[in-house]
Amino acid sequence: MLDVNNFEYMKIGLASPDKIRSWSHGEVKKPETINYRTLKPERDGLFCERIFGPMKDWECSCGKYKRVRYKGVVCDRCGVEVTKSKVRRERMGHIELAAPVSHIWYFKGIPSRMGLVMDMSPRALEEIIYFASYVVTEPGDTPLEKKQLLSEREYRVYREKYGKGFSAGMGAEAIKKILSDIDLEKETNDLKEELKSAQGQRRTRAIRRLEVMEAFRNSGNNPSWMVLDVLPVIPPEIRPMVQLEGGRFATSDLNDLYRRVINRNNRLKRLLDLGAPNIIVQNEKRMLQEAVDALIDNGRRGRPVTGPGNRPLKSLSHMLKGKQGRFRQNLLGKRVDYSGRSVIVVGPNLKMYQCGLPKEMALELFKPFVMKELVGRGLAHNIKSAKRKIERMSPEIWDVLEEVIREHPVLLNRAPTLHRLGIQAFEPTLVEGRAIRLHPLVCTAYNADFDGDQMAVHVPLSAEAQAEARILMLAAQNILNPKDGKPVVTPSQDMVLGNYYLTLERENAVGEGTIFKDINEAQLAYQNGYVHLHSRIAVFAGSIPNERFTDEQRNQLLITTVGKLIFNTILPKSFPYINEPTKFNLEIETPSKYFVDTTTDVRAHIAAQELIDPFKKKILGNIIAEVFKKFHITETSKMLDRMKDLGFKISTKAGMTVGIADILTLEEKHEILEKAHDTVEKITKSFRRGLITDDERYERVIAVWNAAKDEIQGKLILSLDRLNPIFMMQDSGARGNISNFTQLAGMRGLMADPSGRIVELPITSNFREGLTVLEYFISTHGARKGLTDTALKTADSGYLTRRLVDVAQDVIIREDDCGTDRGLTIKAIREGTEIIEPLEERLEGRYSRKTIRHPETKEVIARENDLITEAIATQIVEAGIEEVTIRSAFTCNTKHGVCKKCYGKNLATGTEVEVGEAVGIIAAQSIGEPGTQLTMRTFHTGGVAGDDITQGLPRIQEIFEARNPKGQAIITEVGGEVVSIEEGRDRQQEITIQGTDDRRSYNIPYTARLRVEEGTIVERGEALTEGSVDPKALIRVRDVLSVQEYLLAEVQKVYRMQGVEIGDKHVEVMVRQMLRKIRVMDTGDTNILPGTLMDIHTFTEANREAILSGSQPATGRPVLLGITKASLETDSFLSAASFQETTRVLTDAAIKGKRDELLGLKENVILGKLVPAGTGIGRYRKLKSEVIKETAEVTDEITNI
């Protein structure tokens, strides 16, 4: 058997008839399957034991030889070899066809490969193959031409006229004859000659033919093998037949299809033996051809063959295609043992790295480990009795189970796994009941809630797997989100509310202004009711265990609240004491205004101070990020647990509730509405008098109601009590937002109708008063639209992620430094005057390409190839530098991946990226995962003269698929000055641009909004009108880098507009994959075919060789491919076939005799090899063996002692 981890490549090609026979273990001659009386396979039938192997292990068909001792014996009575029944999954058979049959993939695919080789149209081929016309195979001395089509009548006429002077035939036989006569060398040379002069359609056809000819020539495939003489029969276990209750059988469709082929083949043999008339034989041959077509690809030609209930039968091609096909169902997504799933419930008392595993589940998952331990401890004599003990649930197994699961991490996964944080490792603790307990802080990463979600558990078995799970995947390690490097484990809901309540300040609370000597005294006073959590008090600063206070401050009093004293106990001692939610306090120190001398009148001082805001969700996130930066993983995860516990505790103590009394009504609401009604009335009057158009009226009415709603909202906020539970919930960021509150207590406002147009009748009621019937009806549109939109969006976003993963799955960090001398110059991304992504954020975690100096002092801020940290990035921006050249994935020279320097920092860990990191997949997940948060609709920019601007998910798809954008901007092909803008015919505008040596004019439709005016200086490729630039047009007038920069900025605009932050490097990795190919224009003296799409690296390599040998290099132009197209154009046919268009990819690969070098992840997963990323990459695999050798020696020594 082949060792799965030990082969280098996989090759695919056409099989010759001899090859098919050499695979086969015998010919299938009968269409029978199983004898229905004995339930044994029929001899020479589709399940024959003599051909395919025995049904039962080590037992021949007739029962003469049983038991393993006869291994390898071939029974003399029934001819079955005594072996394992598993061989029925791998032994193939064959059918000797009575007449050659064409393979539908090569004849019917687009373009028809057979047609290109023979230089015939697919239409003509079809007539020949299905016996409608004759084709001349040998014209002899007659005036007929080779490959000329003859109808039945013409054939008879010529036969009478020339007798046997020529030969013509029908069906696949004739095709085979023509194919075997083709001289590939001669044809190739002729085509190359033709290319030198041919133009237009002829040239295109010649190039396509040349491509196929070269493929056949180079791969060693013979064109005549596209016609089958022998048909392989796949192993019976792969097309099984199973008995259902009631004695009926269920069988795979393939058996029906094979049966049809065998029946027709046998009938044809009989007809030929009988010497039947030609017309009957021809009809039977046609039927055989159709049967084989249906078997290979049912439904590709004509009506599909149907089974019971008019259901088309699934052919061999269908077995590979689609989500249920072999590739995606069984090779890329396998079900695994040692796994289980159950409902999740919250485990608030768990540590960050723990999860609760139900006892029954743990016992089943760790069964083998428990059995081994039971035998090891002598509690069971052998494995069998250990198993019995477990099944009986003997009491002693629980102690053993506890021991076994200690420090054995398990993986928890929640579907849909949108990013790598969808699978994390935890240490299991046993819990009663049947639900998995999940730590509340990891819910954000999993996007889990406890309304019935389920999660799956997997057990890593080997020592290496456990080590990887513990070191790389433990939940306590996954604090940062890979997409932007911000903490993903921020407290939510109750935890936020608790910490918000804890850090609130209240005027004149109980015991305000009391002075305490230390925290304990303050807490004691709080517990006895002398002070409140919210009371502002003074504490002797020296008693607080904080290392950041200065000596002077230690001798002073610190003005704070009891709640803040408690809150600060969860932070590390060397972290600033947090007294106010400001950046200064977080990053530098506690502001000195909170320290007063011991002689101060504390009460008067406090009374004069403003109240400080409590700590909201965002601040808690910033605290976590700061702690992570300064103290790293372990300390942060401990601090998070303390924050969680404190939040829950205080939240419980505060006893927040929501009642109808908390929803206050607004006195002024009636007035505001009256005023609005009056204004609307005036607007309507103006419209009736014809002073404004209907559109203007509509826009103004909507503006009036929006203003009214905003006014009510503003007044509501002012009238709210800061301690109102609903206000606290939304202000802290625990749940809800201000618009929810406005709808409860103010007015609901305007709603959209099903088409998305805003209904101008506002809903003036709120939920506390209740809606009228009409208002309720108007509201239902919006509610339904929301739900349907979400459902559609999820599917779209998932498909986008799938395409992104596919195009970038082989991008891995391959080396430390690629040594490139190019870089990417970056500045802040802007939309008009608004900054979308500041320079600071773009710089952090990247390597500088050139030395960066301060523009005035000339002092070096960062050297060439230095990592730009947050501090350096701030320095650069403060020095007033606006653009910086950095190393980027765009300019990286690494083949099949990126190097460490061009990629920069790994956002998920905050440290340098490791060689072997699968950055392509991380990039795809980072862009795809927030996809569900993007909006679906195409926005209408208000006003009459507005183009539709696509935003949200559709815009992201438009960019990555490189489609022509909606609302396309007109770009200039020359750089220079706009000399005139004139109005032309049909109210069009004509813009004229004077370049240095060229003058161009552009006609602009009158609906477009201009971005330039007379005298503006424009560069080549700059947009003249508002809208999106078509990147394909941009690549024609500018260089690749400009297109890459443009795409990067556009993607960032969409995500940032929706408030989603994504690291630039992820977008860079994806965009780079779209621009990997080059289209060859002139081949020079190389042996590349013109018009070929090839990888830039391969192209450069071929040119280097040409230049070194002194010949003419090829020229090409870079091509921008959409992600779907780029995935299908990858060098790996396994990866492409498992993505989309399976049959087309495989047909192409087989003709070219392609080799899959197994560089990406997908192809290795398909073959069951270790993926070449992470610890599976070459350099780490070599390490392993050496380490193992050492440990082996050590163990020997131990045993000797």
UniProtKB/Swiss-Prot annotation:
Note the superkingdom of the native organism.
Bacteria
Q: What does the entry give for GO biological process? A: DNA-templated transcription
Known cofactor(s): Mg(2+); Zn(2+)
Q: Does the keyword Transmembrane helix apply?
A: no
Q: Which residues bind Zn(2+) 1?
A: 60, 62, 75, 78
| Reaction(s) catalysed by this chain's protein | RNA(n) + a ribonucleoside 5'-triphosphate = RNA(n+1) + diphosphate
Name the residues that bind Zn(2+) 2: 818, 892, 899, 902
HAMAP family recorded: RNApol_bact_RpoC
What NCBIfam families does the record point to?
rpoC_TIGR
Q: How does it assemble?
A: The RNAP catalytic core consists of 2 alpha, 1 beta, 1 beta' and 1 omega subunit. When a sigma factor is associated with the core the holoenzyme is formed, which can initiate transcription.
Protein purpose: DNA-dependent RNA polymerase catalyzes the transcription of DNA into RNA using the four ribonucleoside triphosphates as substrates.
Q: What is the name attached to this protein's record?
A: DNA-directed RNA polymerase subunit beta'
- Give the species this sequence originates from: Listeria welshimeri serovar 6b (strain ATCC 35897 / DSM 20650 / CCUG 15529 / CIP 8149 / NCTC 11857 / SLCC 5334 / V8)
